[in-house]
């Protein structure tokens, strides 16, 4: 399942992460993340996977269903923010 812009924003909000924090965790530039979140660019598959992995390490679980698209599971968090 490919991560969506909505899921990225929702996950960041659940974790109370800034774009700067997520970008650093995913190994990408903050302006790149901003462009992705604002729909100005479509991330390469490797970039989308890096973002997804960074969020999952912090306890985000992504779902295939319509709503909610992700939730926080503290038990799955490898990194606490």
Label the model's feature ranges.
Residues 13, 24, 56:
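Short polybasic/polar patches that bind polyanions
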Residues 6-21:
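Short basic helix-loop element that most often maps to the first helix and adjoining turn
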Residues 60-81:
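Helix-turn-helix/homeodomain-like alpha-helical modules used for DNA recognition
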Residues 1-3:
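A detector for short, charged/polar N-terminal pre-domain segments
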Residues 28-43:
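Recognition helix of helix-turn-helix/homeodomain-like DNA-binding domains
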Residues 8, 22-23, 33-36:
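Conserved hydrophobic/aromatic packing and binding residues within compact polymer-binding modules
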Residues 27, 46-63:
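DNA major-groove recognition helix of helix-turn-helix/homeodomain DNA-binding modules
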């Amino acid at each position: 399942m490919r991560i969506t812009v909505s899921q990225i924003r929702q996950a960041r909000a659940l974790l109370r992460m800034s774009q700067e924090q997520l970008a650093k965790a995913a190994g990408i530039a903050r302006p790149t993340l901003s462009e992705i979140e604002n729909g100005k660019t479509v991330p390469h598959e490797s970039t989308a996977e890096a973002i997804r992995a960074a969020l999952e390490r912090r306890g985000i679980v992504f779902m295939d269903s319509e709503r909610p698209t992700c939730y926080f599971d503290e038990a799955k968090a490898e990194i606490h923010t």
